[in-house]
């Protein structure tokens, strides 16, 4: 978020819960294997609700793949299978990102078929789960991880230590 967005969140927190402790942090992204996307034409698979209901134009996979040298994002629309075709009809502004719309049997089957049919060099997985555990990705692929980088104090360790001390848990 930009500074104005952060200040809006701070003001809302103060309004709703004036005594709340706020931890400043950055969410940094890293890839399991950056070499998979470097210089490659990449298919980005992202968290579906983030793109559809959330209206985001990019997700963690796109950001990380750009950071690590992807040269192009391949459009999955010509390769869509099953319910994913309906998803793009309902949400035509998704663009060139493939949303993982759920983890039911049919959804996973459609997602797997679409990924494997897409003409790309590599796949970047920006979903909250390890997608390769539930679908067979037949192309080189790598997963995005999020790391929390706390900035200053208060920090989570200090807040939890205080809570434990004050709660007779320690």
Question: Locations of the language-model features?
Answer:
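Conserved C-terminal guanine-recognition region of P-loop GTPase G domains, centered on the G4
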Residues: 1-22, 134
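P-loop NTP-binding site
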Residues: 17-170
């Amino acid at each position: 978020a930009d500074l104005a967005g952060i200040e809006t969140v701070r003001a809302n927190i103060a309004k709703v819960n004036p005594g709340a402790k706020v931890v400043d942090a950055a969410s940094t992204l890293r890839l399991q294997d950056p070499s998979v996307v470097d210089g490659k034409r990449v298919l980005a698979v992202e968290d579906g609700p983030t793109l559809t209901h959330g209206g985001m134009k990019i997700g963690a996979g796109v950001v990380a793949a750009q950071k690590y040298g992807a040269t192009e994002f391949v459009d999955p629309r010509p390769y869509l299978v099953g319910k994913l075709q309906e998803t793009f009809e309902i949400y035509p502004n998704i663009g060139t990102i493939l949303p993982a719309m759920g983890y039911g049997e049919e959804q996973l089957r459609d997602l797997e078929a679409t990924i494997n049919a897409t003409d790309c060099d590599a796949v970047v997985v920006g979903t909250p789960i390890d997608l390769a555990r539930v679908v067979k990705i037949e192309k080189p692929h790598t997963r995005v991880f999020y790391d929390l980088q706390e900035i200053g104090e208060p920090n989570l360790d200090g807040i939890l230590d205080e809570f434990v001390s004050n709660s007779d848990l320690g």
